[in-house]
Amino acid sequence: MRLEYGLALGLLLAVPAAAQDGAPPVPAAATPAPSPGAPYRDTVLSGRTANAAGLSFAVGAARYELGTGSLWEVTTKDGTPVGAFFLGAGTLAFSAGDPQAARLAARNAKHVGGAKEVDGELRATFSRAAFLFSAALRPAWTFAAGEEPPVRRFAAHVERFARDRTPQVASRLEIAEAARGAYFAATLEADPDLRHVFDPVTDDEEVLRVVDRPAGLPGGFPQMRFSRDLSRRPLGRTRRQAPRVDARLVAVDVDVREGPAPWGELKVAETFVAVRPVSFLVLGFATETIYRNDLLETRLRALTDGDGRPLPYALGDGELVVALPKPLAPGARLTLRLDYEAPYFERAGGDNLWELPIASGWYPQPLAFNSSHHTFHAVVRARKPFLAFASGETVRRTEEDGWNVLETRLEKPVPFATVLAGKYTTQESTEDGVTCRVASYGIPKEMSGKMLLSVFHGVRKFYEWLLGPFPWKEFTIVEINDYGFGQAPPGMMRITKEAFQSSIFTDEVSSLFSHGINQRVAHEIAHAWFGYVVADASPEHQWISEAFSEIASMYAIERLKGKAEGKKLAGTWAGSARHSAKAAPIDLANGLAPKIASTWDSSTAIDRVELVYSKGAHLLHTLRLELGDDLFFTVLRSFLRSFEKQRDVTTDDFVALLSFATKKDWKPWFERYYYGTEMP
């Protein structure tokens, strides 16, 4: 499962930035090294052909039927067969799996295009296609010398798909061949175009996706196409199970230096521990960034192991693929050292602020969310007067020749971390050995800061009584110059400016989540437990972070403002859940594909939030009413204690513990309401 938590559709638009130009740093030459996938990156037609009429073949959940036309053998430049180029009339039938997954795929196809639902399958027609196979999957087609090969049409097909924002293919094909494993990738000229990937080796998934370029993009916008997944099928597991972990990221050390906007310099050391034998690392990485209608590439100056030896790599398409000098045995450790310049430091909208957000790829991370569980150490240099903030406890905060310098360290493993800097003033207080820091954007807001400090410590103490020890020794509440959302990186809360109004906890403020700023602040504090003490294994289980934080915040709001506020919140959840319940089950909410458009697809975003947050919280509230507060919150505390050190927590883990604690089988209930679309 790829680490793709809500790819911002705003990336489809180039947001003008305020004047902040500076000459970009001159990149140093990257260390020459053979690139994984290089033999498969420039394929050619061999000149051998076969009659395609009546041929059919199956890969994974897909069945291809070639009605008319020709197949032309595709090889590497040294003549190794890797697949075929098809010209003619073909059809694809794709089975999404169980009935709920099939419903979701049909919904996505109707919403996004590319295929139509027929008899429970997705079907599409295509006129040209390229099929690439590892040797383990390659059909026994018989090719023979033929007429003049369609070299130009093949080149045009390759070029058509060359700028798609999709994962690397050539490097994965080499990885599969090296492992003597299965791999298949197809590019289909359809309406709109399709990509089909079957990859049990590096990603344990099969994906059918649409690629298209939306209308209405600004003039001069980079020539690229964007993708949406019609269907994703896990391989070798069910979607209820955690994704396979090949190697786990266990330590991250970063040195961040702000440069002329939008550039900065980063030096990163990452330590991995092999869980299975591995010869390659496939990592998500922000290799390209859209800035003022330009596509700026991350400049990797050096990539070595811990001893400084250069490693072969392939960089691009949002990924870094690293070939290891020798296979890692289970339990073996490897350190990567990276030195790169990156255009991540944009002051979006002209704000006096830049951010390196969680799960954005600003440092390389494994594709599977549950493969990242790392400590974090950061040294950050921000240009004065900007103050920097980062996940972790403060080691030092100093000034050096025009820089404000921050060093932090976090020993508790986390799935991701953040760094940001801006024009902030701070105030803080320490209670029970926990320091809370409030960072006000722009002008100082002393009254709001004092109130937020008081609110934080009050909610924290309540949660410690309810859920157990607070996991952070420091917590920073950072004002974001916007409205309507909150986010909880490790040891931090990013919250928009209505939280810094002096009327906090008295005014009704419009909310993104469910019930205004009161509950939103409590929700974000609850993530210290639900998100970091226990964390969801994959997007199918994201409700463990979000809905559980919702139900905890409900109890906090009841204590702060009375039972009536809790009833209002429960009513909001129920109404939102009813609105979106039929869109998908909760476990498939992150599979709802938004339209490929130059504007925000708000309906899909609302459905996802109402399922993961509202319906999930509604289910937990229903359980609370049935079990009573004592037993319900005892189950939550037991859940936290039982799975604190496990990185692969799933919904079935919670159901099993709930059933044990209550001496009742809750599986049928969750089948209907969590894995199904019914409402309790």
Question: Could you describe each region identified by the protein language model?
Answer:
Residues G6-P16:
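Bacterial N-terminal signal peptides
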Residues A17-D21:
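Boundary at the C-terminal end of the N-terminal hydrophobic targeting segment
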Residues G37-A38, S46-A50, G54-S56, G60-A162, ...:
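A surface-exposed beta-strand-loop module
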Residues E117-D253, R337-Y424:
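Extended, low-hydrophobicity, Ser/Thr/Pro/Gly-biased non-transmembrane segments
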Residues S227-L266, V273-S279, L367-A522, I551, ...:
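Hydrophobic helix-coil surface modules that form long, contiguous segments used
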Residues R276-P277, K445, P471, E565, ...:
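Amphipathic alpha-helical substructures
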Residues W354, S371, H457, F462, ...:
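Zinc-dependent metallopeptidase catalytic helix centered on the HExxH motif
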Residues E546, E550-E626, E644, Y673-T677:
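Acidic/His/Gly-enriched intrinsically disordered linker/tail segments
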